[in-house]
Amino acid sequence: MVSICSEAPNFKAPAVLPEGTIVNDFELANYRGQYVVLFFYPLDFTFVCPSEILAHDKRVTEFEQRNVQLIGVSMDSQFTHAAWRKTPISKGGIGPIKFPLVADLTRKIIGSYGVQHPEGPALRASFLIDKEGVIQHTTLNNLPIGRD
């Protein structure tokens, strides 16, 4: 896992933006100059992940007031992310969340941050990245342990 005080690995990947648009060139470096909470989660359409993402989404305004951008990453495709957003919360979806979800089908991003579970998906990990792109704080949880 990358450590605090080190530069956050940059990446360019497909993503679903808050308005639902799919882009193929979402890049972490575009957020230099503001804080970023980059968080990894195992998979879309699972039991614990929607609750974590919806909890983050409820606090987006608080993050924005502090000039902090939330960004989620999993090994799902951008199309799966889009379908998850379109699925009603009552049916295991997440609805129109207000932060980007990055697709990491190749698991290069997950690997560059050192948060890949031996069975393939990302562990539950969060990174606080400062305005200069340096990691200031990290948390890492095994798959069965949710975040609060």
Mark where each language-model region is.
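Chalcogenol-based redox active-site neighborhoods
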Residues: 1-148
